[in-house]
Each structure stands twice: as structure tokens, then as C-alpha cells.
Amino acid sequence: MEGWQRAFVLHGRPYSETSLMLDLFTEGEGRMRVLAKGARGRRSNLKGCLQPFTPLLVRWTGRGEVKTLRSAEPVSLALPLTGSMLYSGLYVNELLSRVLEHQTNYSALFFDYLHCLQSLAGSDGSPEYALRQFELAILAHLGYGVDFLHCAGSGQPVSDTMTYRYREEKGFIASLVVDHYSFTGRQLLALANREFPDADTLRAAKRFTRIALKPYLGGKPLKSRELFRQFVIKPPSEPLP
């Protein structure tokens, strides 16, 4: 590849004695797997910068699925994520690693990702709002189109006083059943506008994104959620990502 691309490290693991195998999220090529030769060596100047949440400029070469990293430079310091914000960032990274195809352009999603990290880094409260916004952005970029404003089949506008049940690949239908797949019209209107003014609409957004993302994740649980359970003492008001 000629020229530099903006990128973030999603995940890295040791490879041989001195190298790293990295999953990158790049602006122009989407998710890339690159081998950073010698990056773990004593004299490597890459040790400090090939970390998650550090904005990078990178160059690589190669024609196979795994490229060879040629250069990497930090654009700025790593975004300061700590506590629940750090685990939320790890969740976002794992989500991208699991659902994005290799070497597919997601340039618009790249900026949604950057905005999500900036929101997490600048938040002194709950990460929930930023996470729901980003999950909905991922679904949109994956082509997961859902009409929150009209009843499937009839095409009638959603009423904020009625209850609707979600059916995968069909949408929402009016229903008297209240269960995990049921949403009020008010909650659907909030999802359509991506505005969650209260805890009720925010919880509904989380429930919907979990339902919608499940087919992309398969039956394998997210490791970041388990890490959150193990290492963070979670107050009642701080739900898992």
C-alpha cells in the first residue's frame, strides 16, 4: 500500500519472540490484519504506540490476508479511557473485530468509532448513550435496515401509545404480547431518532441492539463482557455494555 492511512489497533497478540499480530481498523481498508515485525524487541520504537485507543498513521505491504506493517506513527496520545469507559472501549473493539469483514471499506463507520471513543473519554457518567449510538451505527453500516416508524405488513405509522413486537427480517408488528421482543411505540420513535431522553428508552435501545447484533456474533460470548464481570465492581446503576 502506498501512502499513509489513519488507523486504530483493535487487538494485538504476541507473535514469535519479538513480533506482534495486530487487528487494525483503518479509515480506507476497514479491518486489517498486519504483522508488526520486531515490535516487541528492546530497541523497537513501536512498543508504546501499537496500543488500543491510540490514533495512528500506518503503512503496510503485502498481498495476502496478513499484511506486513512497514511504519506506524501516533497522531496523538491515547484517548484516556479508565474504569467502565475502558471496558466499554474494549467491548467496542471486540464488536468491530467480530462483525466486520476483512479489507472492506467502512470509512464512515471509522469516524463513528472515533466519535464513540471521544465520547467515552470525555464522559464522567455512564457509557450507555455512546454505546447505543455506536451499535446502531454499526447495524446501519452492515446494511441492517429496520423501519422503526411503520408497522411491518400494514405500513401504518407507529403510534406511541401502542405495543409492537419485533420479528427478525420483517420488522415490528402491532401486538398485545409483552416479552423480550416487545417495544412501545414511544421506544421505537426514540430508536428512529437515535435520541434516548430517559432510562426507559435507553434500556429499550440496548435490548434492541442485543437482539439485532446476535446473528452477527453467533453463539460465542463477548470476552469483554466477561472481563467487566470479573474485574469491575459494578454498582447497580452501571449495567454491562
Swiss-Prot record:
Q: Which family does it belong to?
A: Belongs to the RecO family.
- Alphabetized Pfam families for the sequence: RecO_C, RecO_N
UniProt source species: Yersinia enterocolitica serotype O:8 / biotype 1B (strain NCTC 13174 / 8081)
Q: Which UniProt keywords apply?
A: DNA damage, DNA recombination, DNA repair
Q: Does the keyword DNA damage apply?
A: yes
Q: Which HAMAP family match?
A: RecO (MF_00201)
A GO-annotated cellular component: bacterial nucleoid
GO BP field: DNA recombination; double-strand break repair
Q: What does this protein do?
A: Involved in DNA repair and RecF pathway recombination.
According to UniProt, the name of this protein is: DNA repair protein RecO
